[in-house]
Amino acid sequence: QTGIVGEIAHVHSFGKGKLSLGYRISNTAISNDLVNLLGASHYDVNYLEQYLYTEYTGKWNKFGYRVGVGLTNIHNKSAETTQNDWAPTPKLVLSYDLAKNQSLRFSSSYKSQSPSSDMLSPNITLSVPNIVSTGNPYLKPMHLFRNNLKYSFSNDYFDLNTLVFASFFQNYLMQSYSFRNDLQK
């Protein structure tokens, strides 16, 4: 397994806020000789994720804000399939100081998340007798839309944070197990 991660970022301050610009890239290449319950095989895969973004952060009296927009590219390539997914990645954070020790914060974001290497691998794993998990090389990246509203209160004795949230998923990624009585350890 070999991997590389890189990021270039620039921040420019204005009178009332800051502008951030950047580009992040990560690439992982994996070459495996698999020996598992189904036999032996060779498996090569490459995971590439790129993220281009800009964000503006500022404060006006008791009101704070952060507005960001980005573009995420997930490119996964294996012997079975090649997937190329482009997704916008907007982000909005609004905050308001209610009093010296109280605040409200709203955040909203949309992002794309690649399946992990074990989720995409055709490898099969015996968890307990007759119960196995296996990857799926045809999985698509998950898209997550999340909204949060947070109330915070603090004093010398305790901190109270209350969070209300809603999350929506497309192509939800989860681990699954199945019963197989045809496999021997």
What are these model-derived regions, one by one?
Residues N27-A29, S114, Q170:
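Proline-centered turn/helix-capping motifs that create local helix->coil transitions or kinks
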